[in-house]
Amino acid sequence: THFAVALKYTAGQASAPEVIAMGRGQIALQIIERAKNAKITTLRIPILARALYYTSDIGGEIAEGLYNAVAVILAYVFRIESGESIEMPELTLPQEFRFDENGNIDEGRF
C-alpha cells in the first residue's frame, strides 16, 4: 500500500511543518502524480510517510516526535533543490512512530 503526505513549511512563519494533503492507495498515487506534475520534489520514505499519515491531520502541524526526522528531510530537499548532489540521510524514528501499513506499531525492522 502506498502512502503519501504533502508538507508545507515556511521558515519564520510557522512553528512546524503543516500537512496539506495525505492519502493511501490510489489517493496517495494521485498526490504523488500531482506533485510531480507541479515539479515539486517527491521522496519515497515509507517509514516517515506512514508515521505522518497515522499521527497527523490535514491542515495540522506534524507531531512533535517527528520534528527531527522531518527537519533532516527538509534540509536534504533544500540542498538537492539548490543543486547539491548528496545521498539521502538515514532516518531514525522513535518507536511510537514506527507504523506498519495497517497503523499498528511495527516492532520489527527499524
Per-region residue spans from a language model:
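Divalent-cation
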Residues: 1-110
